[in-house]
């Protein structure tokens, strides 16, 4: 069953907008001037983006990552989710403060057709709710507590309690208000009660806001879409350039599912059963060149380095997840991975900077 929604805005084919300026792995960013161009602006609301932040923090937010072209881009997995509750406003504000080049999010559709940031199909792991997300309205979800499970205080600068659950629209508002270029990787979660209506809802929202699926740019945000589900990926490919579509892949052992999805053993068994139906046909989508973004998990990279190197040699951009240790960061650097997704972006940025500068680090003992 497909989710009801407005007719997707159809972008005329063959229209190429002028681009200039560097972004790793692409031709550049849209500038002002000419039809369809956009001007990058900072937040214009009288309400400060980050309440209570000091001037140095604000400077860090507004300063572009000038040397990003010299290193992998670092994406914050569900925001800075080691520090704050995953997929909440606080996690994304912290990711911005940490200097992440981009952020990653998972989306689910509510009963009344809103795209909310939530990883699991069921409520409960990260909230005091129960039942499927798809059977709740946005208003019902707003009434739930999505932060207490993490047991960390939320600074005033990171949003009020009732602001923590985000829709995709609200995340885009947050990212657009930041005075620098940011990447956004949007993952659709399956199985979904709405089928490919989930992908359609993502496309409708992005195009309504002015996203260009050829260049990937939406103002200051470089947007890409991704899924483990091959049908979801191929649905995106009907409208989006392969440069901005990522096929996610992973070996589906119970251990790797538990680690990557941060769930208990019983849930891992259920997730693994579903993923085994999806992953085998997913790999050829990368090897056949249907997409240009390859999204293997770090354990897949360790277990299949020849495959990963072959993808890179064939022109794929590697987006590896979830990289939270110095050892895994080193593996990515040694293989020439272009994008790293992590729960600890500040730490990974530091490790990458040290590696680029040839600075010895105490973490090298982890290679044993």
Residue ranges and their predicted role:
Residues 2-368:
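Phosphate-group recognition and catalysis centered on beta-loop-alpha active-site segments
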